[in-house]
């Protein structure tokens, strides 16, 4: 899980979602997981 000030999709499988007011990227590749914070 990477924590970044700005989250972006890395590949086509990445999905930008909101959970509990946080913007997150979920993907089939675990290295692409990101959270804004």
Curated annotation (Swiss-Prot):
One of its GO terms (cellular component) is cytoplasm. Pfam families: Ribosomal_L36 (PF00444). SUPFAM superfamilies: Ribosomal protein L36 (SSF57840). GO terms for biological process: translation. Keywords: Ribonucleoprotein, Ribosomal protein. GO terms for molecular function: structural constituent of ribosome. The keyword Transmembrane does not apply. HAMAP family: Ribosomal_bL36. Belongs to the bacterial ribosomal protein bL36 family. This is Large ribosomal subunit protein bL36. The gene is rpmJ.
């Amino acid at each position: 899980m990477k924590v970044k000030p700005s989250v972006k999709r890395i590949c086509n499988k990445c999905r930008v979602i909101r959970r509990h007011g946080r913007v997150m990227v979920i993907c089939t590749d675990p290295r692409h997981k990101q959270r804004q914070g």
